Amino acid sequence: LGLGYQSVVKVPVDKNKKMDRQALKQLVEKDIQDGNIPFLAVATIGTTDFGSIDNVKEMSELCKKYNMWLHADAAYGSGVILSEEYKHRLEGINLCDSITVDFHKMFLLPISCSAVLVKDGSTFDALTIHADYLNRQEDEEDGYTNLVDKSLQTTRRFDALKVWISFQARGKDGWSKIITTSMSNAQYFYQQLSNDKNFEVITKPEISSVVFRYISEKTENTDEINKKVRRQLLHNHGVVIGQTVSNGHVCLNFTLLNPLMTHEKLDSLRELICQLSKQAEEN
């Protein structure tokens, strides 16, 4: 928004890596007391690391009370709405004033392919500009189609074609199956890791990201072990997984989006990580 870092207030998260709603309320009220004007709250529908989903319904009530705009960053998690099994996790997303969607994430399309959805289409009028050389007023009145009003850069690529073709090919049921499969695989992987005393899982996945770490009984240097295992997975086994930090500890981050992934492959991966971790532990 071009307001500078000083205008952005970071809100703490709870133990499940979701926005702390009580902290949000307190920060908004403090801003008002300090003479500031809080006008926008951003909920995350699928955080980058943990895939956590903020409670949009409660945030909406707060935003209505203080006349704030509610935006949902659903770049990662927007596809959950198409899963018949898991769509309830996005309860209240319809209450948002605007939503960000990245079709190049859960929808598996080539980058870049993103969209901003707004509840009130007239919101885009803020982008409207008229000039003799650009989007003349009389042209608009005569019904000419012009993409000037559709983006800040006054034009855009035909990325919508990717979305249209994929939905024509797969349909709602096809996407529901793909997204549900990825989320169910994440639940399975989480459960298997939770039952394995060699691993600590940071939080229960809400979408398809599982964040975990190997726990060593022989050394306190588990951070280096997890880093080493990640490198070995890449260079020796062709397995690419992410890395992040939680509570000061290095963790591995596995985001499942491939609908062809099976439980057997996930079991093999868990066993491989455990084997490599124990080898690193000895060295």
Regions flagged by a language model, labelled:
Residues 1-122:
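Conserved PLP-enzyme active-site core in the AAT-like
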Residues 15-16, 46-48, 77, 104-106, ...:
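Short, glycine-/Ser/Thr-/acidic-enriched flexible segments
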Residues 26, 54-61, 65, 188, ...:
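Alpha-helical scaffolding segments of alpha/beta enzyme cores, especially the outer helices
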Residues 63, 193-194, 233-234:
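A generic structural signal for well-ordered alpha-helical segments
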Residues 66, 91-197:
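Active-site C-terminal subdomain of aminotransferase-like
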Residues 200-205, 241-246:
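Short beta-strand
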Residues 201-233:
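Conserved PLP-binding catalytic core of the aspartate aminotransferase-like
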Residues 246-283:
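PLP-dependent enzyme catalytic core of the Aspartate aminotransferase-like
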